[in-house]
Structures are given as structure tokens and as C-alpha cells.
Regions:
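Alpha/beta enzyme core
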Residues: 1-233, 239, 244-259
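Shared catalytic-loop signature of beta/alpha-barrel
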Residues: 262
Length: 262
């Protein structure tokens, strides 16, 4: 089992020195990979500096930069999402999160959710699809993503844009619809020689973790499962690191390959 540590700026706290300190701490305490999830600042300069100092695999979520640089949905075209993946790959990152499994077919399945879409990337893409009446460009033009990934030897981390944000939404139709799409995309990537990680929930009750790991292994043909937690309770605000450690420990024993600390 491998551990990923997230670092990154916010619009109100932009400091290369702070990010370098976070990176050093993550590596000191044994992180196997690091993701820069910055949402503000001088992107290229910070990412270049961190890449130069990080011996571990280094990942990004490209849609964060698209979202932050745009002033509204009207500013974001399909090519912008694909071009940003190319930009990050060309800069030298090892893996990128891409929310390719959020499709128009899943939108009606969200109606009865308690907490809706809690993933930043997922929320952005659902809003984009509703605004334009078009399919998710990362799904529609997936072959272009595969070409980029193969050219730059980048692993695609297929994001769980419809992950449940509370226990009541766990393993619902929207989550499972996305998981099945990610399985299809996994096999298409393998056929093109592209490596894949499949991201997973999210908020899950303790007794649903085994089922979710088994479902991922089934639908995604055993691709490495990268889980955010899972968080096993909704009533531990401020203590997500504890709830996530409990869920992550169980998920790891059941076959999850990659844990994202929270």
C-alpha cells in the first residue's frame, strides 16, 4: 500500500516557501507520492520548483488551475480542459487526476442526493455540462487524453467526481454509474499502453468499505484503487484525519493500493 500527501496553495495563501516546507515534511514522514492541488498563485513557477525538489512521483489535478483562472463558466471551452492536461504533462508531472467518468447520463441520478456533488472537479464539470448542454470533454475526447499520457509517460488518475459526500449518499446510483464508466475507460487506456489509477470515495460507512473495494476490483479489472479516506462518519468535522485513518486502514487490508491522507 502506498500513501499520497496533498500540498498546495490557496487564493489567499500563496507562498513557495510554505509549499516547499510541506513537501519536505511529507517526504520526511514517508509519503510515497505527492500531489500539488494549488488553487492560486504563480502556478508554473511553484510547480517547477516543487518538481525539481521532489524525488517521489508528483501529481496534479489539472482542472483546479482551469477553474481558478476562469472568471466564469463562459470562459471555459472544451479545448481548455484538454490543453491544461497537456500543459501539466509537458511540464513533467508523473500523474494527473482527470474527471473523465462524470457524464451527462449521470446527471439525473444526482437529484435525490443529500449533499450533491462534493468533488471540486465533479461540481465544475456537472455545472459546465448543464451550462453548455454538451458531454464532458474529458470523456468525449478521452482518446486525446490517452495520446497525451502516452507521449509524456503520464499515469492517468481517473477521478471520482461523483464520490459521496456523506454516508447517506454512499454507493448510490450516481457513484456506481461513474465507477462503471471508469472501468470502461481503464480498459481503453490499457489497450493504448497508458497506466491507470482509479480514485474512489469518499464518505462510506465502515460496513460498506469491503463492498466498495470489491465493486471497484470487479468493474475496473483490478486496476489500482486510490481512496480518499474513506471517511467513516459525517460527525467528525475537524477530525477527518482520524476518520480517514480508520477507513483507510480497513480499505488497505481489503485491497486498496493507494491511500490519500486527509
Amino acid at each position: 500500500v502506498k500513501i499520497n500527501a496533498n500540498i498546495g496553495t490557496s487564493p489567499h495563501d500563496i507562498s513557495l516557501e510554505k509549499e516547499q516546507a510541506k513537501l519536505a515534511a511529507a517526504l520526511e514522514y514517508g509519503a510515497d507520492a505527492v500531489m500539488d492541488l494549488s488553487t492560486g498563485g504563480y502556478w508554473v513557477e511553484i510547480r517547477t520548483a516543487l518538481l525539481g525538489q521532489c524525488p517521489a512521483p508528483f501529481g496534479t489535478d489539472t482542472i483546479y488551475q482551469v477553474m481558478t483562472e476562469a472568471t466564469s463558466l463562459d470562459d471555459v471551452k472544451a479545448d481548455d480542459l484538454l490543453d491544461m492536461v497537456h500543459h501539466h504533462a509537458k511540464q513533467g508531472v508523473d500523474f494527473v487526476t482527470v474527471h473523465c467518468g462524470v457524464t451527462r447520463a449521470a446527471l439525473p441520478l444526482l437529484a435525490k442526493r443529500v449533499t450533491g456533488v462534493v468533488s471540486r472537479g465533479g461540481a465544475f464539470l456537472t455545472a459546465w455540462m448543464r451550462r453548455y448542454g454538451q458531454e464532458n470533454p474529458l470523456y468525449e475526447h478521452y482518446d486525446r487524453l490517452l495520446e497525451i499520457a502516452r507521449e509524456y509517460d503520464v499515469t492517468l488518475s481517473l477521478g471520482d467526481g461523483l464520490r459521496p459526500g456523506c454516508l447517506a449518499d454512499a454507493t448510490d446510483k450516481a457513484q456506481l454509474h461513474e465507477l462503471k464508466v471508469l472501468g470502461e475507460l481503464t480498459r481503453r487506456a490499457w489497450a493504448k499502453g497508458v497506466q491507470i489509477i482509479v480514485e474512489g470515495p469518499g464518505h462510506l460507512p465502515l460496513n460498506a468499505i469491503q463492498k466498495n473495494v470489491r465493486l471497484q476490483q470487479k468493474h475496473c479489472s483490478g486496476a489500482p484503487f486510490y481512496v480518499l479516506g474513506p471517511l467513516v462518519t459525517d460527525v467528525a468535522s475537524g477530525y477527518d484525519h482520524i476518520a480517514g485513518a480508520i477507513g483507510g486502514a480497513l480499505a488497505a487490508t481489503l485491497g486498496a493500493a493507494f491511500l490519500c491522507y486527509v
